[in-house]
Swiss-Prot record:
Residues 118-272 form the HD domain. Keywords: Hydrolase. Pfam families: HD, HD_assoc. This is Deoxyguanosinetriphosphate triphosphohydrolase-like protein. GO terms for biological process: dGTP catabolic process. Belongs to the dGTPase family. Type 2 subfamily. SUPFAM superfamilies: HD-domain/PDEase-like. Coiled coil: none annotated. The gene is dgt. It comes from Bifidobacterium longum (strain NCC 2705). InterPro entries: dGTPase, dGTPase-like, HD/PDEase_dom, HD_domain, PHydrolase_assoc_dom. The keyword Ribonucleoprotein does not apply. One of its GO terms (molecular function) is dGTPase activity. The keyword Hydrolase applies.
Length: 475
């Protein structure tokens, strides 16, 4: 029996079976009602498999109740929404997401009405992620959740603030924006509590939380990784490891699910395309300079210094040549409505170009059907990778690297460090500047290391403007 009109409205006219399986199927009658056959259920139901050595591991297809499980138990909810739709709603309504509106992307938040903030960047990542996820058969809400969550842990002043907090937290497990995201999702954002009274954060489903974990290893695992690929990034602090171990039950070690890989790529696409758009619109970058071979050499040199020598200079040059040859930079920009429209159309063309190339390459490798969770890996053609990095290099050369030479760049580091010092000044007595929720965490702490983590949590939660304002009052 085919889907009814109402069901098609809920699931979409071409919803993959894996999407439909996200709905709780409570009876044979309901299975028949939504038009899922026994063969469909066998093909796409998520289950545990036993390996040759007897180990229980996750199978690699679809979504089921295991993926909908939450870290803290919750009472049954209305069937009007899927578990993944609830995840997305919790993030949309979170204060952590709202705060991104006043946090820097590449230009200081609030200094230009055109340029993006972390929030607008996040929304654009989510739109791109949903598009790629739909092309590859993922549940769009799982991908959307990963995209909405991916920057929640960024402190004030972006990577600059991150570096300052990492230095301060060196002896207590470090600081990393992705690990802070995990902490926000599973502890700091107020929504759900464990039966024993501990905060469970927004308590996302396993599939949604797993999709948001971009670097699925601890700091200790990163430091001893033989390939050296994880030397700086990690996703969890020592006191948050229990939820990480629960999250990764049965998952391949250090592997990222397809939905997380889509989020990661969508972030790169949005960052590369939109930050160049901002650079052009604000006058930081004029594409005409790309006609100068010496300028291209300088940009490529800076790109490789920033992103690593693994990016071949000749291939980066070829990427710039392709983008120019195919008119994917505006020939002229003067701020008029017409030039803004041309710029916007070019950004749309670039996003479509990258999404199409990835879909084609991934489908060529894995074939049709839903590509979910640990069933597959996203395939990014080399030319696409180089074009994305070339665009990111433009933002580095014309915006990010010059900012690091500005006096205020060093001042940002000092502001973040000063705020932590003030909050810790009277330890074990709490500072009057601690917000209520962090004051409660402070009062539950038993030593200075725990209290330092609380101080870092509060400073990391600040926006650029609130950090400046608090510093002007306290320091």
């Amino acid at each position: 029996m085919p889907l009814t009109c109402a069901e098609r409205h809920i699931f979409g006219k071409s919803a993959p079976i894996s999407r439909i399986c996200a709905v709780e199927l409570t009876s044979v009658a309901h299975i028949r009602e939504v038009g899922i056959t026994a063969a469909d259920m066998c093909a796409y139901a998520w289950h545990m498999e036993t390996t040759l050595d007897g180990e229980q591991v996750l199978s690699d297809e679809g979504y089921n109740a295991f993926d909908e499980e939450r870290w803290a138990p919750e009472p049954p909810k209305s069937k009007s929404r899927t578990a993944f739709e609830r995840d997305r709603a919790r993030l949309i309504h979170s204060s952590a997401l709202r705060r991104l509106g006043a946090k820097s992307q590449i230009l200081i938040a609030g200094t230009d009405d055109f340029a993006r903030t972390r929030l607008t960047h996040t929304l654009e990542v989510a739109q791109i992620g949903r598009q790629i996820g739909a092309l590859l058969g993922c549940d769009p809400d799982v991908v959307d959740c990963a995209c909405l969550a991916h920057d929640l842990g960024h402190p004030p002043f972006g990577h600059n603030g991150e570096r300052a907090l990492a230095d301060i937290a060196g002896n207590i497990g470090g600081f990393e924006g992705n690990a802070q995201t995990m902490r926000i999702l599973t502890r700091l954002e107020p929504k759900i509590f464990h039966p024993d009274g501990r905060s469970a954060g927004v308590n996302l489903t396993r599939a949604a939380l797993d999709a948001a974990v971009k670097y699925p290893w601890t700091l200790a695992e990163a430091d001893r990784h033989p390939k050296g690929e994880r030397s700086k990034k990690f996703c969890v602090y020592p006191d948050d490891e229990p939820v990480f171990r629960w999250l990764k039950i049965g998952a391949p070690q250090a592997a990222k699910p397809m939905e997380c890989q889509i989020m990661d790529l969508s972030d790169d696409i949005a960052y590369s395309v939109h930050d160049v758009e901002d650079s052009i619109a604000t006058g930081a970058f004029d594409p005409i300079v790309l006609a100068d071979p010496k300028m291209l050499d300088h940009i490529i040199e800076q790109t490789r210094a920033w992103y690593g020598a693994k990016w071949d200079a000749d291939k980066l040059l070829a990427a710039f040549m392709r983008l120019r040859r195919e008119h994917l930079f505006p020939a002229h920009f003067n701020g008029s409505r017409e030039s803004l429209a041309q710029l916007k159309n070019i950004t749309s063309d670039l996003i479509g170009r990258f999404c199409w190339s990835v879909e084609t390459a991934t489908r060529d490798t894995y074939g049709p059907g839903p590509l979910t969770r640990y069933s597959s890996n996203i395939v990014i053609p080399e030319d696409t990778n180089y074009e994305i990095v070339a665009l990111k290099g433009i933002a580095v050369y014309f915006v990010m690297a010059p900012r690091e030479r500005e006096p205020f760049h060093q001042e940002e580091l000092k502001i973040v460090s000063d705020l932590v010092d003030v909050l810790m000044a009277d330890s074990p007595l709490p500072s009057d500047a601690l917000e209520s929720q962090f004051l409660a965490d402070w009062n539950e702490s038993t030593n200075d290391n725990e209290r330092l983590r609380v101080a870092i949590d509060q400073v990391a939660s600040l926006t650029d403007n609130s950090a400046l304002a608090l510093h002007s009052i306290l320091c």
